[in-house]
């Protein structure tokens, strides 16, 4: 999916209205999408509760199910207008609705004022929020859904104390929250929290998804993201460029019937140290399970028997002391993965630098391979062949990456542009950044993957897809997606607490089969 900035959305809305679509019409459609989502959320809550009530108490003849309740928090701008319209629609659908504005933040735009009038004409009321009022608190706690329509994509400055009190009321209620366009308090372009932000269970975003819904704290606070078509013609954004996107995997290419192992990619993996022998094995299995034809595990001689004893399909080989021989062996591969379980020995670090300086093949750097180039960034800048780095935040900082502003997306893009490398910044919503300014945000994966060895599997998968000849702009984000999807399949079967990287490995073929 293409992810939009606040400026782009402002321009797209302007074009739509200049093209003859009234702002009130857009607002009405946005509100309808919000009301539909509120109904769905209420059904999800009420169904198990109603079933339990009936099983225990039964339903007296003629008695109706309890009326559904919503508390709608409206801000001063057009996001608030969406809220007023949503409140009216829910009221007309039989909900008990109370709508609130924050002291000093009455509706200011013409469209928001009109929607507030329409709500009142329909029998609704607009009240001033008093977050410490026991009656308001009691109503809030009794609701099926809280609707956040305080601020939308235009927010640029931290929330003031009045708005923070409203946000705190929503977050502390324990009631499902539905956000209009973006959770209030989230910066649209970065996902940063501006003073405080709503913890939404679901966000209905309009026309196009926004960057801040998928990166930074916004990726956590947005909950499930639903994109609503509110009637803005595609022509209003077809000339726009969207360098930031979520990963859309597409279909895998069909393999020719006469293909053989040498044509399916040769992956060379350098790693393994005492106490870290599992890392290259996991990387090798990740490469094989994602389609590599041949995998070589080059490990120090003293751990060779351990690694060789754990390999069936991969070929283990002991490293010699001559860097030229290691280089010659690596040159026979399609791609090299340097670092899984490599350890911190200076000899191994020098070997990594030697390969980077002389190997004319794509290189994936992970784990201790990344630590080896810390302080030697010029080696990366000097490479002519493709280089992919796969750090987590700690490794990224050791490489010189700047996360001080808390904007992982911008930090990843800056580093990729500076070094000429593809950067896979691992973590929640892994970011794959390219030197030309494009970035892909991954939405697959789950907390069960937060265990040692998962990153080794990913490194093997990235190397595998590159070795099979997929173009880098597809291979790298696709590997990240498949890694997360395999983790999701493992979690569905085993749960998030007990799954291991080898469980993830077993699910890679199933994740890939979904794309065949």
Predicted regions, residues:
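Small-residue (G/A/S/T)-rich helix-start motifs and N-terminal tracts that mark the onset
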Residues: 1-102, 109, 202, 213-363, ...
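Internal gly/pro-rich beta-alpha loop/helix module
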Residues: 144-145, 150-240
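Short, solvent-exposed loop/turn segments at secondary-structure boundaries
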Residues: 111, 158-159, 191-192, 400-404
């Amino acid at each position: 999916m293409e992810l939009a900035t606040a400026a782009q959305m402002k321009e797209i809305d302007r074009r739509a209205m200049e093209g003859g679509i009234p702002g009130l019409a857009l607002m009405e459609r946005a509100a309808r999408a919000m009301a539909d989502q509120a109904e769905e959320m209420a059904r999800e809550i009420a169904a198990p509760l109603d079933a339990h009530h009936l099983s225990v108490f039964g339903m007296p003849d003629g008695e109706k199910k309890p009326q559904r309740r919503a508390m709608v928090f409206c801000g001063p701008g057009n996001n608030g207008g969406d809220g007023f319209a949503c409140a009216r629609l829910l009221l007309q659908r039989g909900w008990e609705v109370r709508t609130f504005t924050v002291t000093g933040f009455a509706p200011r735009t013409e469209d928001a004022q009109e929607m507030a009038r329409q709500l009142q004409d329909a029998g609704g009321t607009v009240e001033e929020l008093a977050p410490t009022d026991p009656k308001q608190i009691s109503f809030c706690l009794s609701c099926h859904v809280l609707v956040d329509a305080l601020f939308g994509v235009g927010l640029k400055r931290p929330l003031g104390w009045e708005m923070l009190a409203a946000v705190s009321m929503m977050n502390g209620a324990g009631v499902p929250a539905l956000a209009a366009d973006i959770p209030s308090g989230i910066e649209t372009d970065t996902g940063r929290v501006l003073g405080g932000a709503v913890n939404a269970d679901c966000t209905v975003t309009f026309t196009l998804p926004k960057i801040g819904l998928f990166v930074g704290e916004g990726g956590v606070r947005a909950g499930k993201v639903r994109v609503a078509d509110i009637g803005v013609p595609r022509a209003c954004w077809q000339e726009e460029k969207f360098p930031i996107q979520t990963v859309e995997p597409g279909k895998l290419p069909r393999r020719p019937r006469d293909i053989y192992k040498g044509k399916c990619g040769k992956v060379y993996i350098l790693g393994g140290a005492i106490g870290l022998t599992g890392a290259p094995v996991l990387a090798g299995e990740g490469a094989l399970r994602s389609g590599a034809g041949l995998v070589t595990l080059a490990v120090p001689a003293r751990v060779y028997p351990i690694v060789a004893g754990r390999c069936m399909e991969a070929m283990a080989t002991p490293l010699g002391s001559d860097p030229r021989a290691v280089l010659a062996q690596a040159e026979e591969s399609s791609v090299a993965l340097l670092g899984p379980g490599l350890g911190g020995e200076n000899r191994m670090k020098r070997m990594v630098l030697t390969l980077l300086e002389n190997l004319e093949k794509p290189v994936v750097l992970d784990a201790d391979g990344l630590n080896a180039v810390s302080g030697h960034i010029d080696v990366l800048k000097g490479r002519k062949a493709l280089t992919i780095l796969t750090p987590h935040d700690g490794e990224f900082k050791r490489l010189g990456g700047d996360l001080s502003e808390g904007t992982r997306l911008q930090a990843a893009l800056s580093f990729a542009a500076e070094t000429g490398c593809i950067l896979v910044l691992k973590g929640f919503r892994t970011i794959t950044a390219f030197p030309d300014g494009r970035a892909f945000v991954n939405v697959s994966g789950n907390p069960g993957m937060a265990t040692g060895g998962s990153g080794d599997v990913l490194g093997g998968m990235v190397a595998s897809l590159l070795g099979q000849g997929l173009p880098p702009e597809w291979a790298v984000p696709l590997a990240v997606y498949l890694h997360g999807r395999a983790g999701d399949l493992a979690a569905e079967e085993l749960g998030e607490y007990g799954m291991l990287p080898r469980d993830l490995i077993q699910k890679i073929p199933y994740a890939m089969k979904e794309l065949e």
